C-alpha cells in the first residue's frame, strides 16, 4: 500500500472492518489505483493535484484519517510533504515500512506484534518521534544529516555503529 499525501494532516492507525483493506476520510480528494495479482493487492492512494488560490484564507491542507485492517500483512510506503502525521502502527501487521517526509512533524509508533518489520525513514527538515513498543526489539542504524537523533541507549546500547536491543537475535517481534 502506498500513500502519497501532500500538505496537511495525516492520521493513520488500525480499525478497518474485516474484509476491507482500509477505510477513512480524505478531505481534499484522492486518486486511487489498485491491481490484484493472485493473493497480492498493490494499492496506491494519492492526493489529487490542486492549486489553492492565494486569497483563500484559513486553508489547512489535506486532512486524511485512515484506518487499516489489523489482520492483513502490509508493505507500507508513506510519502508526505509539509504535513503533520500521526502514524500509529502498533496494532497493524506492517512487515515493511518506508516513510519519506519533507518539512513535517511525524509521530510514528511501530508495530507491536508483526514479527519482523523492516523500517526505513527519510526525513527532510522534519521532526520525527519514533516509538518502539515495549516487548519489541530493534536494530537501529541512524545516518543523520542536519537532524538531531536521540536514542534510548539503556534500551538500545550502541556498538559498532548500531543501536541494538540485547535480545534482538531471539526476539519474536523486531
Please give the residue ranges for each predicted region.
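Generic structural detector for well-ordered beta-strands
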Residues: 2, 65-67, 88, 109, ...
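Extended, structured, electrostatic nucleic-acid-contact surfaces
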Residues: 1, 68-76, 111-119
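A generic structural motif
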Residues: 7, 19, 71-73, 94, ...
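Right-handed parallel beta-helix
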Residues: 77-106, 113
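Short, surface-exposed interaction patches in beta-rich subdomains
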Residues: 12-17, 21-60, 97-98, 106-174
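Low-complexity, intrinsically disordered tandem-repeat tracts enriched in small residues
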Residues: 7, 80-82, 103, 125, ...
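A cross-kingdom signal targeting lumenal/periplasmic-facing segments of multi-pass membrane
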Residues: 46-66, 75-79, 86-88
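N-terminal segments that cap or nucleate solenoid repeat domains
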Residues: 1-15, 77-78
